């Protein structure tokens, strides 16, 4: 934790923020292009919409503070603009129930979709059209290289061999790679989400409440709310008190966005975060590569990361 924390602090300056933001932005734009190409060929149904996004701020200072980053992103073709409270409410009428709002940043090209439904649909395409075999429940305990092959052993004793291995195991990647003398600076930051029926005044545009660090995302006839960031919490089990905190914060932010009395499902996940907040996508040698450390942007960066990871694994870069 201490080593990771010191590395994180070394990035905590304006130069580091700009460098890391642009690195992540480039990957996000690659992901958008890759997703568009995939959906043209395979129209997977996952509540996908180009709904736009509003980053909301409780003070005018916060809104103006985002201006420099907007100008920087504009050079990469990203469409964003500053909006005051009235303009934000005109874009998303559901914000009429947010008296704390001072203004925000509007990104009209932002997309939304259900990652679970997408993953199910993509797996079906891969199996039916490309002959991919999925092996679930293989809890990998160790990874070693012998006789020109990678040997994987599961906790139940099963074994696999492979010529190439791509490690995408989130926070568990560090434990798998450490015996190979490969240290990965990845920290677990636990986040929560819940999904509920739409409320009486649910937003259509995706909403980020920067004051409470919450995200509201409409998925068809449901709405998903995500937030919280519990540093160095390696327990994947949801804690009822923390989930209750998330629900209370969502109520305070947008009280009519969801039917908070009828939560359909809740979830907690361990976000694998690097000190510089962008992922590690690297060829590690001998047919081994890694694709880890996406933090809270795993869904945003997934497609571009996958393309880069395959290139690294096959030695194309």
Regions found by a protein language model. Name each.
Residues 176-179, 183, 199-202, 220-224, ...:
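Flavin-binding catalytic cores
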Residues 142-143, 214-217, 281:
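A structural signal for short hydrophobic beta-strand segments in well-ordered beta-sheet cores
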Residues 152-203, 239, 256:
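Central helical "cap/lid" subdomain
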Residues 37-48, 128-133, 182, 254-261, ...:
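Surface-exposed helix-capping loop/turn segments at secondary-structure junctions
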Residues 102-104, 108-124, 138, 177-180, ...:
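Flavin (primarily FAD) cofactor-binding/catalytic cores of flavoenzymes
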Residues 80, 210-211, 251-317:
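C-terminal catalytic lobe of FAD-dependent flavoproteins
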Residues 2-121:
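Rossmann-like flavin
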Residues 83-92, 111, 131-150:
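A conserved short coil-to-beta-strand element within the FAD-binding core of flavoproteins
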């Amino acid at each position: 934790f201490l080593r990771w924390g010191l590395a994180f602090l070394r990035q905590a300056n304006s130069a580091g923020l700009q460098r890391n933001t642009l690195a992540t932005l480039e990957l996000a734009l690659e992901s958008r292009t890759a997703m568009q190409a995939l959906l043209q060929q395979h129209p997977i149904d996952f509540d996908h919409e180009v709904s736009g996004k509003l980053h909301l701020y409780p003070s005018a200072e916060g809104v103006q503070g985002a201006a420099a980053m907007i100008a920087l992103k504009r050079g990469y073709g990203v469409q964003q603009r500053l909006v005051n409270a009235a303009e934000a409410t005109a874009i998303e009428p559901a914000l009429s129930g947010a008296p704390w709002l001072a203004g925000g940043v509007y990104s009209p090209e932002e997309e939304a979709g259900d990652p679970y439904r997408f993953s199910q649909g993509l797996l079906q395409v891969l199996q039916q059209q490309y002959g991919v075999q999925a092996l679930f429940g293989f809890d990998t305990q160790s990874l070693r290289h012998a006789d020109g092959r990678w040997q994987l052993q599961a906790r139940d004793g099963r074994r696999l061999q492979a010529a190439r291995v791509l490690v995408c195991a989130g926070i568990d990647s560090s434990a798998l790679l450490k015996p190979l003398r490969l240290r990965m600076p990845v920290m677990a930051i636990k986040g929560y989400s819940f999904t509920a029926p739409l409320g009486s005044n649910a937003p259509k545009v995706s909403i980020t409440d920067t004051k409470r660090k919450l995200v509201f995302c409409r998925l068809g006839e449901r709405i998903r709310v995500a937030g919280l960031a519990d540093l160095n919490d390696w327990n994947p089990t949801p804690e009822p008190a923390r989930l209750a905190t998330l629900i209370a914060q969502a109520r305070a932010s947008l009280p009519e966005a969801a039917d908070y009395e009828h939560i359909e499902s809740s979830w907690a996940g361990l976000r694998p975060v690097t000190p510089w907040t962008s992922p590690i996508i690297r060829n590690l040698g001998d047919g081994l590569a890694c694709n880890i450390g996406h933090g809270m942007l795993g869904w945003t960066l997934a497609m571009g990361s996958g393309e880069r990871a395959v290139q690294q694994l096959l030695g194309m870069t």
